[in-house]
């Protein structure tokens, strides 16, 4: 079961016999050679898979980093002057220039990279909370599916808790070009940007937290701790676009509190 985490601040007597022995030896050598080739082939396939998984994980990791920055900018959690423009995905993206926020996001991304490469992440959540009331007013959820994970590892625990369920997929993904993946990511960011048209304005000062749903057997640094799901009470939910790479699929969902 995946758990939400957040930062805290393995010798023959005859010629006939000799001939038979030689034949057997040649056969064994053949088998050994065949087995060796088979092992080598499997090893090569494993290396290719690991490289593909690493590359796919990097794509998802970068997407998360820019998602956090985009949400903070678009939702006005910090002043616009605290952000700077950069080019990414063929778009102009806004990233924080505030040293404290940059350090916080960097710490999150450093650990997230390790968990992503290990295939331990099932969900990343950005929660916006009112400083005055402590109420969670907006929740951005990114569900991560790892293709083929379900067929390789089965969860030892079953759960009926939708929030903690592990999204898995045994589908074989279509091969996509880098341009196709980028186009899908562009669509997600355009939707996040356009969400200001239907999301209520955030009243007063707000802060944010990042929750990472990692497998229960994940190594957790001391500065990270268990967290509740920080759900929006009686909130509205809107499903946004998704994107997929060679090994991952990421779905986006935003929940928000309706104005009084």
Predicted regions and their residues:
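Long protein-protein interaction modules used by eukaryotic assembly/scaffold proteins
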Residues: 2-96, 100-102, 115-260
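Eukaryotic beta-rich interaction modules
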Residues: 103-110
């Amino acid at each position: 079961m995946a758990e939400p985490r957040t930062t805290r601040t393995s010798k023959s007597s005859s010629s006939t016999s000799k001939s038979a022995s030689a034949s057997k030896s040649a056969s064994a050598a053949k088998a050994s050679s065949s087995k060796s080739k088979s092992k080598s082939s499997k090893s090569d396939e494993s290396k290719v898979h690991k490289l593909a998984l690493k590359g796919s994980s990097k794509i998802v990791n970068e997407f998360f980093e820019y998602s956090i920055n985009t949400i903070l900018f678009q939702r006005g959690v910090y002043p616009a002057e605290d952000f700077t423009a950069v080019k990414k995905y063929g778009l102009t993206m806004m990233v924080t220039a505030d040293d404290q926020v940059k350090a916080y996001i960097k710490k999150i991304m450093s650990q997230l990279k390790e968990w992503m490469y290990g295939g331990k992440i099932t969900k990343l959540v950005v929660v916006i909370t009112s400083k005055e009331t402590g109420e969670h007013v907006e929740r951005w959820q990114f569900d991560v599916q790892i293709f083929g994970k379900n067929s390789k590892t089965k969860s030892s625990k079953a759960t009926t808790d939708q929030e903690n369920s592990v999204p898995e997929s045994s589908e074989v993904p279509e091969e996509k070009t880098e341009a196709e993946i980028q186009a899908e990511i562009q669509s997600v960011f355009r939707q996040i940007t356009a969400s200001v048209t239907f999301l209520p304005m955030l009243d007063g000062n707000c802060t944010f937290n990042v929750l990472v749903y990692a497998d229960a057997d994940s190594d957790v640094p001391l500065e990270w701790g268990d967290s509740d799901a920080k759900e929006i009470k009686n909130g509205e939910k809107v499903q946004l676009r998704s994107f997929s790479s060679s090994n991952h699929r990421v779905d986006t969902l935003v929940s928000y509190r309706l104005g009084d």
